Each structure stands twice: as C-alpha cells, then as structure tokens.
C-alpha cells in the first residue's frame, strides 16, 4: 500500500525590515549606547548605595565604641545617652535591672524587634539590621547592659534618589547624543552608497554612463571602483553592440543592394513586351544572384557565431582537435582542390566548445586557402609544446600581412585594401580570436618566410589540453578540472586519425601534381 504524497511544506517568507539602512544604523547605535548606559547606571547606583550604607554602619559602630570605651555609660548612663540627642542618632541603654535610658531625634523612635530583644536577653551579642527606614545596631555589653543605636536612612535615600535622577538624565542625554551621532555617521558613511544608487537610477533612466568619483580607500571606495568598472564594461559593451550593428548594416547593405538590382533586372527582362536579354547575360545575372545570396548567408552565419559565443550558454565537451582539423580539411579541399595541404597533426584533446573550435579551425584554413596561389601549399601542423599545451600552425604562401595590420586583422569587419576585392565578411579571424581567447589560448601572426617574396602568413594558435599517446591510453598529467575523466581508448583513435591525415595528404599531393 502506497501512501499519498505529502504536500511539501513551504517555508514562510522572511520578514524584511521597511526601515532604511540609515535608520537601522542609528537605532543600532542608540540601542548599544542605551544598553551600556543602563549597565553603567546600575553599577554606579549599586556601588554608591553600598558605600553609603557601609558608611552608616561604620558611624554606628564608631558611636557605640566611643560610648563604651569612654566609660560614661557606667559612670552616668542617663547623661551619656542624653548626649546623643545632639547628634543624628537615636540611642537606648537597657540595664540588667530593666532601667531604660533613651534619646531620640525629633519625630523618631528607636524600633525594637526580635533581633534587639535577643541582644537584650543575652542570646545575641551583636545585631545590625534595617527597620522603619532606620539602620539599627544592638550590642550586648560585658556588664549585662545592652546599647542600641539607630540612624535614619532618609538622608541616604535622598542622596540615592538624586543620584538616580542624575544618572537617568545623563543616560537619556547619552542615548540622544548616540542617536544623533549614529545618524550623522550613517549619513556620512552611506553617502557613497547614495551616489551609487543615484548613478544606478541614472543609468536605468538614461544612457549616461559617467563614472562616479572615488573618495578614500575603504570598502565603500572599493565598491565604487567596482561599480565604475561595471559602468566601463557596460559602456564598452554598448559601443561594441553599436559598432556591430553599424558594421553589420554596412556590410549587409552592399550585397543586398547588388542583389536587389540584379533581381529587378531579371524581373524586368521577364515582363511582357520587354526586350529579352541574351542568354549569356541571363546566366551571368543568375550566377551573381547565387553568389550574393551565398555571401549574405556567410555573413549572417558569422554574425550568428559571434553573438552565440557572446551570449553564453555554450555546452562544453571533450573535443579531439585531430578530428576537427580532419573535417575542416575535407571541406576546404572541396573548395580549393588546386592547392596542396601538408598536414602533421598529433592527437590532442581540448575541453571546450566543439562547434566554436571547429569554426575557428575552418576559418583559419579557409583564410589560408583563399590567399594561396594555384598550386601553392598550405601547412597545417598541430604539435605539443609542453605537458598541457599544443600549438596549431596554419601557414600559406600568400602575399602576407603587413606588420602594422596584424593586430587589426582580428577586428570585426576589418578588411585590408587587398582583401576588399576578395570574397569574405571580415568576421572570420574575429571569430578565431574570440574562440581561442574563450578557451584560454593565445594566437599570433608571423611571416611564413621572413623576407621572402611572397612572405606568406602563418597563424600560431596555442590551446590548453592534454595529449593522446598513439597505441595506448596513457596521458600526461593535467589539471583534472579541465577535462573529462573517461578517456579510454583515446590513444588508438588519435593514431588512426594521424594515419588518415597522412594518407589523405598523399592523395592531395598527387592530385595537385596531376593538375
């Protein structure tokens, strides 16, 4: 018997405070100061109160000691007790014969309780307690008499009351000052956050991406610097987007205009009563239309590749570069069967975007084939340079690239004066650069034959990865985070690919010689 599924318990959303950060900082400072003030006030009140009560006890003991040691209680007890009336204490002397001598302050009487009675009866020698707002000391003397002295606590209570009032006022002022200071500190400290907020709102409303001034070197200053970096990145992104749209529009306009002209001419020639164009011209127009459509398709495909890489969401997998080179060579050979390809490729695996790597290699080979003269040779070499890097070199025997233009050839839509007469979108090498950098590689351009005529062009692409050993599955140690762990039988596949490239190479050489 299966139980029905239990409904999932959703956690209630957390309550978020509606108070601003400034108010929260101020309230926090005020609360902390209030807590400290309360603790300090309680401590001060307790210490002062204890000191005052100890002082009263000391006074009572001193008076009793003075009366006892002076001998006046034995000589003239009545006079001795009456003399205390001129001080601030109440006194009583109880003799064994039950004669009692008292002297009280105006409006006061010395209270007698169980403790005092025990002292008078001799059960206790000393008693000290508080009763009826008085501090009472009872002492049993050696002659059997008992001396009782008390002091009013009213003056002490007044002092403690004034102390409590002062502490309350001082504490309240301290809390108020803490609240004001906390508000000022929060306002000053959060001023950079306010500037960041205003800048973010300004960016959301307008296209104003001006950086924010940075003051100091604290955490808020670093936050401002990070925000400025984000603004600069956003500015560059918008500039690249605007430049891409502008360049794409310009590049699309030319083939579209030519295509429209040719289509309109073909339509006009087919209109009733219109003069017929010669068949040769019609065939030329149709060929131009097909070529222009292919040019548009290539341009749109390159744009899609660029935007796909920038948008992200690419699936990474283990890519065998030997297979990528092999497939790219097959496509290029179909377009240029009049040139020779000299291929030397080792087994090498890269963890990355398979489609992007294939497009980058194809663009390099297409570029080399496009600039190679009939009967020329294109070199393709993939060699391992260190345990975790391999270098792909694509060389041609073309006119070469001037040193001043070598950095520009990787820019979008850049085409040199010599390249404008050749087919292409100006995006191929830009895609190569984007793919290589995305995979943590590097690339450079050099002459194939420095000082030669023609010098040719060689593209060097460095890619991180790991090798495949021919005839086995051993591999060099590489960081595990970069690659898939399952690499079984990889070496044998690499061996077969190298043989296949060599055989195909031989066929291309013989074919080129026959041509």
Curated annotation (Swiss-Prot):
Residues 187-239 form the HAMP domain. It is a multi-pass membrane protein. Keywords: ATP-binding, Cell membrane, Hydrolase, Kinase, Magnesium, Manganese, Membrane, Nucleotide-binding, Phosphoprotein, Protein phosphatase, Stress response, Transferase, Transmembrane, Transmembrane helix, Two-component regulatory system, Virulence. Coiled coil: none annotated. It catalyses: ATP + protein L-histidine = ADP + protein N-phospho-L-histidine. The chain crosses the membrane at residues 25-45, 166-186. It is found in: Cell membrane. Residues 46-165 are extracellular. PROSITE patterns: HAMP, HIS_KIN. Residues 247-467 form the Histidine kinase domain. Autophosphorylated. CDD domains: HAMP, HATPase, HisKA. Its EC number is 2.7.13.3, 3.1.3.-. One of its GO terms (cellular component) is plasma membrane. Its main location: membrane. GO terms for molecular function: ATP binding; phosphoprotein phosphatase activity; phosphorelay sensor kinase activity. The keyword Glycoprotein does not apply. Member of the two-component regulatory system MprB/MprA which contributes to maintaining a balance among several systems involved in stress resistance and is required for establishment and maintenance of persistent infection in the host. In response to environmental signals MprB acts both as a membrane-associated protein kinase that undergoes autophosphorylation and subsequently transfers the phosphate to MprA, and a protein phosphatase that dephosphorylates phospho-MprA. PANTHER family: SENSOR PROTEIN CREC (PTHR44936:SF9). This is Signal transduction histidine-protein kinase/phosphatase MprB. It comes from Mycobacterium sp. (strain JLS).
């Amino acid at each position: 018997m299966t139980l029905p599924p239990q409904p999932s318990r959703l956690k209630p959303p957390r309550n978020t405070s509606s108070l601003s950060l400034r108010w929260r900082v101020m309230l926090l400072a005020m609360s902390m100061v209030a807590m400290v003030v309360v603790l300090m006030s309680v401590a001060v009140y307790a210490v002062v109160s204890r000191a005052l009560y100890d002082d009263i006890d000391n006074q009572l003991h001193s008076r009793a000691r003075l009366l006892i040691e002076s001998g006046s209680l034995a000589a003239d007890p009545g006079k001795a007790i009456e003399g205390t009336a001129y001080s601030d204490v109440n006194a009583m002397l109880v003799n064994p014969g039950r004669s009692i001598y008292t002297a009280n302050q105006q409006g006061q009487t010395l209270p007698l309780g169980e403790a005092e009675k025990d002292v008078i009866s001799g059960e206790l020698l000393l008693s000290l307690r508080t009763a009826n707002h008085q501090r009472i000391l009872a002492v049993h003397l050696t002659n059997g008499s008992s001396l009782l002295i008390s002091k009013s606590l009213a003056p002490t209570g007044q002092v403690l009351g004034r102390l409590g009032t002062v502490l309350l006022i001082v504490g309240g002022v301290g809390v108020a000052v803490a609240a004001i200071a906390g508000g000022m500190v929060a306002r000053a400290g959060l001023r950079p956050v306010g500037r960041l907020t205003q800048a973010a709102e300004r960016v959301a409303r307008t296209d104003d991406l001006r950086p924010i001034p940075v003051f100091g070197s604290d955490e808020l200053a670093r936050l401002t610097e990070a925000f400025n970096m984000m603004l600069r990145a956003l500015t560059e992104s918008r500039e690249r987007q605007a430049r891409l749209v502008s360049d794409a529009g310009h590049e699309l306009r030319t083939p579209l205009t030519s295509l429209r002209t040719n289509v309109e001419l073909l339509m006009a020639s087919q209109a009733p009563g219109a003069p017929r164009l010669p068949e040769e011209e019609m065939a030329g127009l149709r060929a131009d239309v097909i070529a222009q459509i292919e040019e548009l398709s290539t341009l749109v495909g390159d744009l899609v590749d660029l935007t796909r890489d920038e948008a992200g969401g690419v699936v990474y997998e283990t890519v065998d570069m030997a297979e990528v080179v092999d497939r790219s060579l097959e496509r290029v050979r179909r377009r240029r069967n009049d040139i020779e390809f000299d291929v030397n490729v080792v087994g090498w695996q890269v963890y990355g975007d398979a489609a992007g790597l294939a497009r980058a290699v194809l663009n390099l080979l297409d570029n080399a084939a496009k600039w190679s003269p009939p009967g020329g040779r294109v070199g393709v070499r993939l060699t391992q340079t260190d345990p975790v890097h391999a270098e792909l070199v694509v060389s041609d025997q073309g006119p070469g690239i001037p040193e001043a233009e070598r950095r520009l050839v990787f820019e979008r839509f850049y085409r040199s004066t010599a390249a404008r007469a050749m087919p292409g979108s100006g995006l191929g090498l830009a895609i190569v650069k984007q793919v290589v950098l995305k995979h943590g590689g590097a690339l450079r351009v050099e002459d194939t034959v420095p000082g030669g005529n023609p010098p040719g062009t060689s593209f060097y692409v460095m890619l991180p990865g790991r090798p495949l050993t021919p005839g086995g599955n051993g591999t060099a140690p590489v960081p595990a985070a970069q690659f898939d762990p399952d690499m079984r039988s990889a070496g044998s596949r690499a061996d077969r690919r190298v043989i296949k490239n060599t055989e195909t190479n031989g066929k291309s050489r013989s074919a080129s010689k026959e041509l």
